Amino acid sequence: MRPILLAGHERALTQIKYNPDGDLIFSVSKDQQICVWFAHNGERLGTYRGHQGAIWTIDVDPTSTILASGSADNTIRLWDIKTGKCLKTWDFPTAVKRVEFNEDGTKLLGVTEKRMGHLGTIVVLDIKIDVEAEQSDEKVMTIVCDESKATVAGWSYLSKYIIAGHEDGSVSQYDGKTGDLLYNIPIHELNQPITDLQWSQDRTYFITASKDKTSKLISSKDLEVLKSYTADTPLNSAAITPKKDFVILGGGQAAMDVTTTAARQGKFEARFYHKIFEDEIGRVRGHFGPLNTVAADPTGKGYASGGEDGYVRVHAFDKGYYDFLYEVERERQNRLAAASA
């Protein structure tokens, strides 16, 4: 897998997102700009300028019409993907650490930071997927996290629940319409923050990454832990691959804790685990510094990772990736082939 190296940022990457068709990659970093790239060849399409602080998060609506970003300048901004025009700015008392559209793109949630006497919150905004439309200033719903602040959050299937990962390692399920807390379950080690939360394609389950060196596959409906993946380094990001039953984990020693310069020492690799059997099946090296974000191409053709080194690396899967099967999987395939013959 020879990667395409995307060098468009001057500082550490914070999040990468593919659009739903998998043909565009959006990347954000601490250098205050959003870049958009063609996924197949790594050509830069353009940048979206306007934020006045590090950008923590990005999301694309299901039709690839508008883009939402959250930043340390205490704003969420909405952009016209095609023209790069900023359509709307919402102001908050603290930094915005995560944004995510729901399945049909009509709502956007934002996770705000706990700072300066303000509690961490999850806010919901109504969105019109139309670049000409006037977007509403009103926040439809605000969930206050008075126990432990939310670090990540997202919408489950049919926008039924809002799922949030917290700084204390717990996961919460809120009612998507009323904002009522339904469950709060300790999933990761106490006080080991959850660093990422990414969905399966149908949003019935999701994967978390945590500083406790583990990643969990969890059901959206009842927050039951379905699978657990153990790594040897704190994790910053985790993604579920479509087409094949794998998950990709990214992490590495925190940049400030790295004392040796050898890339192997810091464990700066993307790790592939089998989603069902929980075994590590391979690693992809390349970043010079921790991986801050990984994203799987929704069409199943590859994945991208963004590191503390300021680079985005886009990998296209080769034949060996698709052919790889466990013995039991191969036997099952042969049985099915024999049955249909």
Curated annotation (Swiss-Prot):
It holds the Pfam family EIF3I. One of its GO terms (molecular function) is translation initiation factor activity. GO terms for biological process: formation of cytoplasmic translation initiation complex. The keyword Lipid metabolism does not apply. WD repeats lie at residues 8-49, 50-91, 135-184, 189-228, 286-325. GO terms for cellular component: eukaryotic 43S preinitiation complex; eukaryotic 48S preinitiation complex; eukaryotic translation initiation factor 3 complex, eIF3e; eukaryotic translation initiation factor 3 complex, eIF3m; nuclear periphery. It is found in: Cytoplasm. Transmembrane segments: none annotated. InterPro entries: eIF3i, WD40/YVTN_repeat-like_dom_sf, WD40_repeat_CS, WD40_repeat_dom_sf, WD40_rpt. Keywords: Cytoplasm, Initiation factor, Protein biosynthesis, Repeat, WD repeat. HAMAP family: eIF3i (MF_03008). Component of the eukaryotic translation initiation factor 3 (eIF-3) complex, which is involved in protein synthesis of a specialized repertoire of mRNAs and, together with other initiation factors, stimulates binding of mRNA and methionyl-tRNAi to the 40S ribosome. The eIF-3 complex specifically targets and initiates translation of a subset of mRNAs involved in cell proliferation. Component of the eukaryotic translation initiation factor 3 (eIF-3) complex. Belongs to the eIF-3 subunit I family. This is Eukaryotic translation initiation factor 3 subunit I. It comes from Chaetomium globosum (strain ATCC 6205 / CBS 148.51 / DSM 1962 / NBRC 6347 / NRRL 1970). The gene is TIF34.
